[in-house]
Amino acid sequence: MCADFLDKVYKTEYKDPRDLYRDWADTYDNELAQNEYTTPIRTAKALTKFVSNKSTSILDFGCGTGLSAEALISCGFSNIDGIDISNEMIEIAREKRIYRNLECFNPNKSIPVKKNEYSIITAIGVISVGAAPISIFDEVFDLLPKDGLFAFSFNEHSLMVPEYSLKVEQTVNEKKAVQLFCELGPHILKRDLKSMVYIIKKL
């Protein structure tokens, strides 16, 4: 295990996040398990409060090695598709056989998903400093149909950058969405890091 990768992601030592996740893929699960990464299970449990049909198709945006899908499955969700920018992460997720479909995409192009295809989209530990920029928020949100749910998190490093929380406030204030859930809690316990978990419903 290379414990330095958690430091590198927050210090954004890689210009292209694909390079970071290429190098991190083999040790990613072990490093996050040893540091007690809790945001995925917090988000999955929160979703259960608002979803009655757990067989509803979910898009796990930025699925990585599948840690978020594992949390979702542990909470009873069963039909999950994943997309990510890292081939190396996708291959590890594929070996777990927990996704219906997996696809790697180019972050410099449009997200390869049809509008209204999924009524639930998750982006758990994805939109943050050192990973997907806040500019991707609207593109992901726009894929949802009316009444669709967007479950996502911002870690505390991202919460220190005003544009992250302001994006949520703007989306709600412009009556594009209603906020169903917002909770600050543990993100990576061994690093004493926190994250905010959100669930918003598209109007």
Question: Predicted segments — roles?
Answer:
Residues 1-26:
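N-terminal, positively charged/glycine-rich alpha-helical extensions of SAM-dependent methyltransferases
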Residues 189-203:
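Core SAM-dependent methyltransferase catalytic element
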Residues 147-155:
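Conserved beta-strand signature within the Rossmann-like core of class I S-adenosyl-L-methionine
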Residues 119-133:
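A short SAM/SAH-binding and catalytic strip from SAM-dependent methyltransferases
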